[in-house]
Amino acid sequence: MAIGYVWNTLYGWVDTGTGSLAAANLTARMQPISHHLAHPDTKRRFHELVCASGQIEHLTPIAAVAATDADILRAHSAAHLENMKRVSNLPTGGDTGDGITMMGNGGLEIARLSAGGAVELTRRVATGELSAGYALVNPPGHHAPHNAAMGFCIFNNTSVAAGYARAVLGMERVAILDWDVHHGNGTQDIWWNDPSVLTISLHQHLCFPPDSGYSTERGAGNGHGYNINVPLPPGSGNAAYLHAMDQVVLHALRAYRPQLIIVGSGFDASMLDPLARMMVTADGFRQMARRTIDCAADICDGRIVFVQEGGYSPHYLPFCGLAVIEELTGVRSLPDPYHEFLAGMGGNTLLDAERAAIEEIVPLLADIR
């Protein structure tokens, strides 16, 4: 069956401002720079590689549909939505609230298309029109909690999609697996009390946000036990991530048996990413994707939707993403040109500290019903 693919030209037009992280600041002697760390060119280069590699011929292009207010309000507060409308209407846009998440004038349109792209792909996969798919959306979403924008994220795209699956499509159990290297704090916040969405975050311990993503953060009320954090030590690579998949993630998914799996697909755990200190390669992401796709085939008739999150290496992110796309289509196209350079740098042996960090999570899975 067809594999869906979402890209919109406007995803490459996200205005990240003139600074490298926060806005340029003459007083602090922070120079303007042409490429913010979250500059949209990185995602655009991924899309262009999908086309140049020939993978686009094996995908079904899906037009993004702008998320409605009703879609957004399933994950966010009315106050947050109104604030984003306000910032978007400023003559030159502005800071959405945390000092690093900028929105240009009219940027709300792109944010709606990003969340809406995830929703539209989810709808088509959930209804059987497509077997699976990849939404290469921008801006990302997993840091945005219920009431705010944060960490380059305006709306929480995976949560907006999960909310749609629950409220409109009638799904009773949805899982969100987030392997972006930074803690999925926004997703955790939105579903904290709700067992109808299982949230799993694999991330570098204490990277971003500060003081967030501990294994002890497990949800509350009826949602206790349905939020799983797997904080990994800096320097973790393919071996640690695959051990976490095998010992925690796949067991959690099989215990929960969701009707749909949504993957927050960030590639900032790669060896070449500037915003983390992990050592995953394109082949590591390939193997993680393969395991998750196979798990979906076993437990939810293959219904799986990948939604782009972070990743800040314009050099390597496209090839990490291509590896995941290839696992969806079942067609190999290009080898990883960085493989030989990275192969000897480590990350392929499971270290004791990594094993311990992962295996302390295993007993927590007993609370999933």
Curated annotation (Swiss-Prot):
Site feature (Polarizes the scissile carbonyl of the substrate) residues: 312
Single GO molecular function: metal ion binding
Root EC class: hydrolase
Record text on activity regulation: Zinc, and cobalt and nickel at a lesser extent, are able to increase the catalytic activity (2.2-, 1.3- and 1.1-fold respectively) at concentrations of 1 mM. Higher concentrations have an inhibitory effect. Magnesium, manganese and calcium have no effect on activity at concentrations between 0 and 10 mM. At 100 mM, the catalytic activity is increased between 1.2- and 2.1-fold. Hydroxamates like TSA and SAHA inhibit the enzyme. Is also inhibited by azobenzenes, stilbenes and arylazopyrazoles.
Source taxon at top rank: Bacteria
InterPro entries according to UniProt: HDAC_PDAC, His_deacetylse, His_deacetylse_dom, His_deacetylse_dom_sf, Ureohydrolase_dom_sf
E.C. number(s) listed in UniProt: 3.5.1.-
Keyword RNA-binding: no
The entry's keywords: Hydrolase, Metal-binding, Zinc
Entry's pH dependence statement: Optimum pH is 8.0.
Record's keyword annotation contains Metal-binding: yes
List of residues binding Zn(2+): 180, 182, 268
Pfam families referenced in this protein's UniProt entry, alphabetically: Hist_deacetyl
Family: Belongs to the histone deacetylase family.
The protein's assembly and partners: Homotetramer; dimer of dimers.
Record-given protein name: Histone deacetylase-like amidohydrolase
Source organism of the structure: Alcaligenes sp. (strain DSM 11172)
